Amino acid sequence: MGWLPLLLLLTQCLGVPGQRSPLNDFQVLRGTELQHLLHAVVPGPWQEDVADAEECAGRCGPLMDCRAFHYNVSSHGCQLLPWTQHSPHTRLRRSGRCDLFQKKDYVRTCIMNNGVGYRGTMATTVGGLPCQAWSHKFPNDHKYTPTLRNGLEENFCRNPDGDPGGPWCYTTDPAVRFQSCGIKSCREAACVWCNGEEYRGAVDRTESGRECQRWDLQHPHQHPFEPGKFLDQGLDDNYCRNPDGSERPWCYTTDPQIEREFCDLPRCGSEAQPRQEATTVSCFRGKGEGYRGTANTTTAGVPCQRWDAQIPHQHRFTPEKYACKDLRENFCRNPDGSEAPWCFTLRPGMRAAFCYQIRRCTDDVRPQDCYHGAGEQYRGTVSKTRKGVQCQRWSAETPHKPQFTFTSEPHAQLEENFCRNPDGDSHGPWCYTMDPRTPFDYCALRRCADDQPPSILDPPDQVQFEKCGKRVDRLDQRRSKLRVVGGHPGNSPWTVSLRNRQGQHFCGGSLVKEQWILTARQCFSSCHMPLTGYEVWLGTLFQNPQHGEPSLQRVPVAKMVCGPSGSQLVLLKLERSVTLNQRVALICLPPEWYVVPPGTKCEIAGWGETKGTGNDTVLNVALLNVISNQECNIKHRGRVRESEMCTEGLLAPVGACEGDYGGPLACFTHNCWVLEGIIIPNRVCARSRWPAVFTRVSVFVDWIHKVMRLG
């Protein structure tokens, strides 16, 4: 053997910093402690002088009598343990301070290579025979002596002689001296169906044999797939996974020169029964992975590129590699788990775009009754919300403490848990819910067919606002055109950027309270989707601000509340209040049912698609003229509702495109900026002389205040 192979082998064994981590030998259970139930058995003392969990792993790894360790995430303490969760008289317990790391060889139920390192607790052979204890010489005599190093414990299957067939044991049957235990290799223990998004096996090597980097580490390769942000992707330890919709499972490698590689995993046979994705053709549910309709343009009306073509855009999403994703012709699809169906476009300057013009399938349950007016006189017995959630009794104080009770509202007949409208909510009867995450929701009711909804009131003579809707003069508007089509660089301190788990901008929003953002329902796959890893960015004009920009505030999203049916609105509650300053300000909410007079000049702001009119870097602001719904409906053939409003560009084409959705239509009224509309997907964005449609915020102001009041 030459000196170079020896050097490479030596550096691998020593675990050179920046390559292999000692944590690679461990599986982690977050927020978990391992207790031993026998008081006479005590774990090792806490060691408080460790830098991180990697140092703990470096201490535990070489010790034969260390099989696991606790890592205290707050004090950075380390406690070495001589047992695992499979040891007798132990139990797992949830913990708010500790993570539990256990050596893979002791907790894996499959084997790597020929299983020489297997230290599991399988104790029966492939033929079902009990194993003989290694310390016994009867009924079958043998030469092996149990030690800590060879791991010949109890009567567990082991492979002390490196048998190619894997772990084995002597049996308790005098007629069968020894037999294989038939433990599957980790490669064979779990198979891949479709593109392997649901693969949760324990293979931690790539197809070239390189060891995988742990998902919870950022070396040797930095990446966005932090396990704490992608809770639904199974990013366990350093096992092969597919969190980004690649053609098959992969991992980052411990080789600094090779960032990532695919893993060699067997495909499932026809007998495997994968989770069936519900398919739809006229609408889409969730993120639209099951959409199989024929929409073939983007929200902006740009034709889609065929999936089997590589012009004008080269890509990896070919029908052959994604056979189960139905990548037919140029239809909108979602092969990679994006926020909604999308496609590559035929426009060379626009690589890909979403197809938000496809409507979402409603998840409301079928109405069980009807009501007149606002439903204040409804006295029926419906007791479920529009989502099918059971109503809380009006007399109960859990899970929500009610503000309206039979005592406080004797005329509202707040009986049992029946839907009522004690506060005159304009969106109909409602109730407190039995879901701890949802204080209240509207009920499974519809307006009666013979009931005419009230028309929007005339605008009041005076609108007064005091502490919101103020800003410093915008930046020089003559510099350039930007991403709102026909727009200019500007300051819109209430406009926020919604960021997904990879930190990418996907929608806009408006700061209406220090802890609340108003945005569009179309930006989210579900009203109950996991929000871990989603953030709101405020205080910057740049789509990709520099690291450490002093005015940037990044706040995690804690909660989502979907608006009344048909509103297309969502309120996001932040984990903490933002700090208001010149770069971060509240925008005023309009009075209820306020109608912006035609001819009013308003502005939209965002970081969305520009159709080639500008660069990617700065917040865009564009002016638009408000027009009446009557004029708007001439072009839109009567489809614009009173809960919507319209604008037409002052300089065609001017308007909102993809990436701007959820952002504000702000109008300057009585020396204040007022949030009059929310940008929603239009059939074609920024089309010359074609009215753009927005959700009219004033129709839903009572709901906004109610949600913020109830928290």
Swiss-Prot record:
It comes from Homo sapiens. One of its GO terms (cellular component) is extracellular space. Residues 1-18 form the signal peptide. Glycans are attached at residues 72, 296, 615. Residues 110-186, 191-268, 283-361, 370-448 form the Kringle domain. This is Hepatocyte growth factor-like protein. Gene3D superfamilies: Hepatocyte Growth Factor (3.50.4.10), Plasminogen Kringle 4 (2.40.20.10), Trypsin-like serine proteases (2.40.10.10). GO terms for biological process: negative regulation of gluconeogenesis; proteolysis; regulation of cAMP-dependent protein kinase activity; regulation of receptor signaling pathway via JAK-STAT. One of its GO terms (molecular function) is receptor tyrosine kinase binding. Cleaved after Arg-483, probably by HPN/Hepsin, to yield the active form consisting of two disulfide-linked chains. Residues 484-709 form the Peptidase S1 domain. Changing residue 689 to C: May be associated with inflammatory bowel disease; results in reduced binding affinity to MST1R. The lineage of its organism: Eukaryota, Metazoa, Chordata, Craniata, Vertebrata. Disulfide bonds join 56-78, 60-66, 110-186, 131-169, 157-181, 191-268, 194-324, 212-251, 240-263, 283-361, 304-343, 332-355, 370-448, 391-431, 419-443, 468-588, 507-523, 602-667, 632-646, 657-685. Belongs to the peptidase S1 family. Plasminogen subfamily. Keywords: Disulfide bond, Glycoprotein, Kringle, Repeat, Secreted, Serine protease homolog, Signal. Dimer of an alpha chain and a beta chain linked by a disulfide bond. Interacts (via beta chain) with MST1R (via SEMA domain). It is found in: Secreted.
